[in-house]
Amino acid sequence: MNVVKGLLVSVLCLSSGLLTAQSHHSQWKKVYERDLTDFELSPEGSGLVLFAKSQGRCRMDVDFYGETGKDKYQYEFTRDRLTAGSHREYRYTVASLSEVTKDKIKLVRNEKLNPASGAVKKEFRDIYQYVPNKVLKKYCF
């Protein structure tokens, strides 16, 4: 009986370990970050963060900050092929940027982007150029 219990406990531990490893494996890993403020892409600054998953799948999160709010773009891609995208627009509910906190930001637009759209592809390529080729080759190709 103790052997059966021991075997059952071993199987359960192994199963939960595999599930944990699988869920950890499927998460995005931050591999690159860049402040784009010096490029003057928006009035109050901007930045991008590149995340990678297995099999060359990457996601680029780009934030543009303005005086009245911020825009957040998210692009998923493999190599240089855009596979998905989204755009969220937030407005600050206070007059001064120094007073902005998480509870003082309101989501005013949440849209999926069409990865086949020429305009979306152009926006993606315009930002994609700020990630060094060696980083893209290592994680996204």
Per-segment meaning from a language model:
Residues 63-103:
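Mid-chain, structured segments of secreted extracytoplasmic proteins
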Residues 1-8:
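Bacterial N-terminal signal peptides that target proteins for export
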Residues 105-141:
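C-terminal partner/receptor-binding element of secreted or periplasmic proteins
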